[in-house]
């Protein structure tokens, strides 16, 4: 029984250390790890880091940057990648339509 408890305790410690060491994977706390104070063009990791609430990965191998949300007629991406950022484009800004076939369109 003592061996089992030791194994469970060690497993929990290793699990916690693994989660703490990898901030790319997992859920982001509400409000993000930092306040949304980054301007468009500044590097970000998650949407919550940006004043615009949109962090975009434009190309693989390039850093994510803050960007404006899309306006009517502009390219958009309604989906979000796990971890809290967008691929290629931001979603539509409030009042600028719905992202249909990757373009913000008023309905």
Curated annotation (Swiss-Prot):
Post-translational modification: Contains 5 disulfide bonds.
Gene Ontology cellular component list: extracellular region
Keywords: Disulfide bond, Secreted, Signal, Toxin
Intrachain S-S bonds: none
Any GO MF annotation of the entry: toxin activity
PROSITE patterns per record: COLIPASE_2
Tissue specificity remark: Expressed by the venom gland.
Domain of life: Eukaryota
GO terms of biological process kind: digestion; lipid catabolic process
Predominant place of localization: secreted
Entry annotated with the keyword Disulfide bond: yes
Annotated compartments: Secreted
Signal peptide positions (record): 1-21
Similarity comment text for this entry: Belongs to the scoloptoxin-18 family.
Name of the molecule in the record: U-scoloptoxin(18)-Er1a
